[in-house]
Amino acid sequence: MEKLKINLINSLDFYDKCLLGNGNENSFRYELMQPMKTMWDYLNVPLKATQSNGYDIVMASEMLGIWTPRKSIQQVKDNFPELIESGIFEEYQEVISKGIDEFEKRGYSIPLEEIYVNILLGDEDSQEMKVNKGYSGFGGIPGYIMLMIVPNDFNKKRLKSALAHEFNHNVRFTFEPFNHGDVTVEEYIVLEGLAECFAEEMYGKELIGPWIADFDKEEMEYSIEVIKEGRMAKGFGEVSAYMFGDDVAKKRGYSPVGLSANAGYTIGYHLIKQYLVNSNKSIAEATLTPTEEIIRVSKFFD
């Protein structure tokens, strides 16, 4: 089988164009986002709205925390040089290649011909960026990865780890597809735990994301109980309350369930850690294991 091709979307040219005063919503749509049209189609997001101010790729990007030409150009002036300085534009290929090798070593040929990577500036004013120390990602559709970054000292050294996390999602979804409307809490905590443990395996514990909280024993036990009770809850809105915690749930209009920030991510991470010990499997092998088996072998909720 041919080697999986890694394509970087040329966001550098787009931001250069913006700095010269030539970037607009259409160049955002057709130069920066059109190469990922298949991903956006899966998410039911049109490149251009049929009516003025309608839902389209620009609005959806802003909801994800991505800078668009509707926002202040000063952000690009301030943040673009730092994004280049982070080194991620030189290192993205090595991250994905290293990830592919981890699976090929275990006999899993990822059933994709290519992966598109889009490294984007985040919007400083976005809540998404603020709650995640200025960076986030999306790897929910196999073959497409986005990283959104408002560069700072905390996140610049963690970008490779974040990219590895999103790559793991891509692989996981080729093995166990994900339905946003029908996902359970159990599936989501396993998914995020796998991705962060994979990133940790590749780049070290000191570079894991801020979405893994440092709970004390009491908080950990309480969170496990709440999630254990609600782990079969379904649907992205309800599940999000367990994953992101009460503050984010309230802001997004979901019913809070009594959890701290990022509780689902944190519990998922520790659940996978326990599974790896109990199963004696590698994180790549765990990524290719059904959710049900991971829960059972981890004995985390027993």
PLM feature segments, named:
Residues 79-141:
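Auxiliary, metal-adjacent structural segments of Zn-dependent hydrolase domains
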